[in-house]
Amino acid sequence: MVEYKDSLAFIFWRNPEQKGSVLKSIGLLDKIRGLSKKDFFLYLMIISIFLPFYLFLGLFALYLIGLLVTGEMKGIIKGLAKHPVLLFFIAYSSIISIVAKNWLGLVASLLMFLFLIFFSFYQKRLTHAFFRLILQTILFGSVLSAAFATLEHFQIVKKFNYAFLSPNMQVWHQNRAEVTFFNPNYYGIICCFCIMIAFYLFTTTKLRWLKVFCVLAGFVNLFGLNFTQNRTAFPAIIAGAIIYLFTTIKNWKAFWLSIGVFAIGLSFLFSSDLGVRMGTLDSSMEERISIWDAGMALFKQNPFWGEGPLTYMHSYPRINAPYHEHAHSLYIDTILSYGIVGTILLALSSVAPVRLMMDMSQESGKRPIIGLYLSFLTVVAVHGIFDLALFWIQSGFIFLLVMCSIPLERRTLVSDMTD
C-alpha cells in the first residue's frame, strides 16, 4: 500500500468513514484506496471528464505537465513509434489545416496529438481491475449527471453559460438538458455510452449490488437521454443494445430482450418531451439535408486532401451556406475535413484494433467485452448518420477510455474478466 501523507491524495484517504459514504455503499471506495499513487492521479484525471470542458482541459494540461516533470513523458513519446499511421494522420491533419489557414482545425489536430500521448500512458497503466473501476465510476458519474439533467429540465438550476469564454457562446437549447457537456447532443451520446456500460457490467458481475446498480443506472440514463430531447440517440441506443444482446447471449433470450429494449426505446422516443420534437422532424430533416448538400459542395472543391478538422465551420462562407460547427454527419464531415487521402489514413489506423477484436471473438468467454466494443461502435455509427457528437472533448474521451482497452482485454484471461 502506498503512503499518501505527503500528497494531496491523503485528504481523500484520511477518513473513509466520513467521506465518500455513497461510493463506499456501492463498493468503489475500497478499490479506489487500493490504487497506486500514479493510478490514483490518473483516475482523478479521468473522472474530471464530468466537469465543464474548460475545467477538464485545464486539469488535462496540468496532468500532461506533471508527466513531463516526472520524466514519464520521455518514455511515452518513444512509445508513440508503435502508432506510425496514427501519427502520420495527425501530422497530415495539421499540415492541411495550416495550408487552408484553418486555425481551429490546427488546434483540434494538436488536441488529437495530446490525446494520443494521454491514452498511450493510459494503456500502459491499465489493468482489468482498474478498467472495471473506471467503468463503474463513469456509471456512477452518469447517475449524478442525470440528476443534474433533471434539475435543468425542471428549471431548478440554470444551464451553464459559456459567454464568458466568447460572446458567441450563448446559452443554446434552453429547454434541453446538457449538464456539463456543452450541448444536448453530446450529453445524449454519453448517455448512450453509459447505458452500454451498464449492460456490460450487469452481464459480467456476480455481485448483486452491482447488478441492481446497473439496472438503476441504465434507466436513470434513459431519463437523462429523454431530457436531452435528442431524437437521433434513441435509434442509436436501440441498435447498440440489440447488438450487445445478440453478441453476448446468442439465443432466443437475446431476441425477446431485444424486443423489450425496442419497446422501451420507442416509449421514450414518443414520450411527452421528445414527442414535441418529433413533431418538427420534417423541418429538421430539411435543414439537415441542406447542411449535407453544403458539406458535399465543399467536399467537391477539395476532394482529395480536405482542409482539416471543422472544415465546414471554416469554409461555409465560401458557398453562402448556413453557419454550423460541422456537417451534421460523421460520414460527410470526415471526408469533407480530411479528404479521400485522410479518410484512407483513418481507416488504416483502425486495422490493428479490428484484428485484435477478431482474435478475441474466437474466445466465447470474451463475448461481453466484444459486445461492449461493438455496441459503442454501433451507437457512433447510427448516431453519426445525423450528427457528429463524437467529435467533442468529453464524448470522444469516454469513447477512447473504452476502446483503448482492446489490447489489454486481448491479453486478459477469461477467468479474470468477472467480479
Question: Language-model features: where?
Answer:
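Transmembrane alpha-helical segments and their membrane-water interfaces
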Residues: L67-K74, I96-T150, L356, V382
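Alpha-helical transmembrane segments of multi-pass inner-membrane proteins
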Residues: R132-Y162, V179-T248, A352-M357, L377-A381
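A conserved mid-to-late transmembrane alpha helix and its immediate loop/hinge
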Residues: V179, L222, M296, Y323-M357, ...
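Long extracytoplasmic/lumenal interhelical loops at the membrane interface
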Residues: L274, L281-D293, A297-Q301, W305-Y338
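A juxtamembrane structural motif centered on a specific transmembrane helix
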Residues: M1-K37, W209, K366, L401-D419
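A membrane-periplasm/extracellular boundary helix in multi-pass inner-membrane enzymes
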Residues: A147, H153-I156, L245-M285, D293-Q301
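Loop-to-helix entry and N-terminal half of a specific, functionally important transmembrane alpha helix
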Residues: K37-M45, V85, M358-D387
